[in-house]
C-alpha cells in the first residue's frame, strides 16, 4: 500500500489517497473516526481542538461498507476554514489586503520548519511553510493508520500505545498482562499513562508549562501483538521492517529519537543480557524467554510483540517566544506565535500507534498478498501453523 496526503492546516480540508488496499475488507467511517477522536484528546491540547471535531468522509474505494480494491480517498474538513477563507484561499489577493489581515509570518520560530522551508522554496511569507509543516497533517496520517489497524485486526494483530514519560516524569508502573489491558488502561488516563501517580505529576507539569508560556515533550511506546514470524526481510537494507518503522516514527512532527525494544540500553549491557533465548513447545511453537529486542531479529519479526519507543521534543511554538530575526528587516524580534499546545505527547502516542500500524500492515501484505482479505487471512493462518511445526 501507499498513500499521499494533501492540504494545509487552515485550508478547506485534508485529503489522503490510499492505493493497494485489499478488496473485501469491511470498513466504516466510524473505524476511522474512532482514531481521529483519540488523536484530538489528551491533556495539554490547545484551543484548536475545541474548534475541530474531525470526521472522515470516505469518497472512493468503499461501497456498502466493503473495500473494492480501488484507491480509497479520505477527506477531513477543517472547521476553522471559515475564518481563513481569504487568507488561505487559492485566488490572488493584493499586498494591501494581505497587510490588513496581518497573518504574514516573517519571524521564524526556533525549532520549526519556518526559516529552512522559506529559504528552500523562496517564500517571503513563511505561512506557506507553516501551513503544510503543521502537525495538523497527522490527522490524515492517523486516518491511514486507522485503515491499517482494521487490516491488522482482521488478521489477529492488535496495536496499542501509551506514554512512558512527559517533562522528565517517568512512569514506573508499566506492566500489563495483555494488549487489551494496555489499551484499556491507556484510554482511562488523561495523559495515556499506565502509572496513576505519574499521570497526576505529568498533568501538573503540563499545567506549569502552560502557565509559564512554555512547552514540554516526552516518550511514547507502541506495542503490536499477534505478529507472524518473518515480516520484513534480512536480504536487503530497505526491506528490514524495523528500519521502516524507525523511519516512519522519525517522520512524525517533533519526533527526535526512536528505540526498538530496550534500544540504547543495549549499548550498556553484555550480549548475554541483551539477546532473547529461544524456546519451543508443541502448544506455542517458537518463543523467546524475554523480549529485549522488541520483536525483531535481522530486520524481521520473530513472533514476539513489536515494541517501539519514540521521543517527542517540546512543541516549538511558545507563548513566551524565543529570540528570532525578522527576515524582512533582519532586526532581532521575538519569534512568531501561533495557536498551539503546551504538550501534545498523549496525542502523539496515538499518531505513533497509527504510523507503526501502517508499516506493519504493509509488511503483512507484502508477505501474504494484497488482492482480497479472505485470501490474506487464510495465508496468515497457514503461516502460523507452519511456523509452529517448523
From Swiss-Prot:
Complexes and interactors: Homotetramer.
Gene: aroC
Keyword Amino-acid biosynthesis: yes
Protein name: Chorismate synthase
Originating species: Shouchella clausii (strain KSM-K16) (Alkalihalobacillus clausii)
Residues engaged in binding FMN: 132-134, 253-254, 298, 313-317, 339
Gene3D superfamilies: Chorismate synthase AroC
InterPro entries cross-referenced by the UniProt entry: Chorismate_synth, Chorismate_synth_AroC_sf, Chorismate_synthase_CS
Catalytic reaction(s) noted: 5-O-(1-carboxyvinyl)-3-phosphoshikimate = chorismate + phosphate
Keywords on record: Amino-acid biosynthesis, Aromatic amino acid biosynthesis, FAD, Flavoprotein, FMN, Lyase, NADP
Residues the entry annotates as binding NADP(+): 39, 45
Metabolic or biological pathway: Metabolic intermediate biosynthesis; chorismate biosynthesis; chorismate from D-erythrose 4-phosphate and phosphoenolpyruvate: step 7/7
Amino acid at each position: 500500500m501507499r498513500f499521499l496526503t494533501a492540504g494545509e492546516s487552515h485550508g478547506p480540508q485534508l485529503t489522503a489517497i490510499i492505493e493497494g488496499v485489499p478488496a473485501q475488507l469491511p470498513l466504516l467511517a466510524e473505524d476511522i473516526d474512532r482514531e481521529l477522536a483519540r488523536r484530538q484528546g489528551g491533556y495539554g491540547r490547545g484551543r484548536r481542538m475545541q474548534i475541530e471535531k474531525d470526521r472522515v468522509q470516505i469518497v472512493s474505494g468503499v461501497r456498502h461498507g466493503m473495500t473494492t480494491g480501488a484507491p480509497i480517498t479520505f477527506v477531513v474538513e477543517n472547521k476553522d476554514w471559515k475564518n481563513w477563507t481569504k487568507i488561505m484561499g487559492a485566488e490572488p489577493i493584493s499586498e494591501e489586503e494581505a497587510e490588513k489581515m496581518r497573518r504574514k509570518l516573517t519571524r521564524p520560530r526556533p525549532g520549526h520548519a519556518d526559516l529552512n522551508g522559506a529559504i528552500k522554496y523562496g517564500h517571503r511569507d513563511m505561512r506557506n511553510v507553516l501551513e503544510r509543516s503543521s502537525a495538523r497533517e497527522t490527522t490524515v496520517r492517523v486516518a491511514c493508520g486507522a485503515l491499517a489497524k482494521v487490516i491488522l485486526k482482521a488478521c489477529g494483530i492488535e496495536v496499542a500505545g501509551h506514554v512512558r514519560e512527559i517533562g522528565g516524569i517517568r512512569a514506573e508502573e508499566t506492566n500489563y498482562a495483555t494488549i487489551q489491558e494496555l489499551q484499556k488502561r491507556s484510554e482511562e488516563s488523561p495523559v495515556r499513562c499506565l502509572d496513576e501517580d505519574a499521570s497526576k505529576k505529568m498533568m501538573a507539569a503540563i499545567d506549569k508549562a502552560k502557565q509559564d508560556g512554555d512547552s514540554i515533550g516526552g516518550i511514547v511506546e507502541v506495542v503490536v501483538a499477534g505478529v507472524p514470524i518473518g515480516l520484513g526481510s534480512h536480504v536487503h537494507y530497505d526491506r528490514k521492517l524495523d528500519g521502516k518503522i524507525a523511519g516512519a516514527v522519525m517522520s512524525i512532527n517533533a519526533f527526535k529519537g526512536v528505540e526498538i525494544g530496550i534500544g540504547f540500553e543495549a549499548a550498556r549491557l553484555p550480549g548475554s543480557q541483551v539477546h532473547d533465548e529461544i524456546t519451543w513447545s508443541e502448544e506455542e511453537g517458537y518463543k523467546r524467554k524475554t523480549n529485549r529486542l522488541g520483536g525483531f531479529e535481522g530486520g524481521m519479526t520473530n513472533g514476539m510483540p513489536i515494541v517501539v519507543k519514540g521521543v517527542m521534543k517540546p512543541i516549538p511554538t511558545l507563548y513566551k517566544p524565543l529570540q528570532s530575526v525578522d527576515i524582512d528587516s533582519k532586526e532581532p524580534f521575538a519569534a512568531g506565535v501561533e495557536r498551539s499546545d503546551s504538550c501534545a505527547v498523549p496525542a502523539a502516542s496515538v499518531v505513533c500507534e497509527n504510523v507503526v500500524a501502517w508499516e506493519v500492515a504493509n509488511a503483512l501484505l507484502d508477505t501474504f498478498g494484497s488482492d482480497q482479505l479472505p485470501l490474506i487471512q487464510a495465508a496468515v493462518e497457514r503461516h502460523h501453523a507452519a511456523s509452529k511445526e517448523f
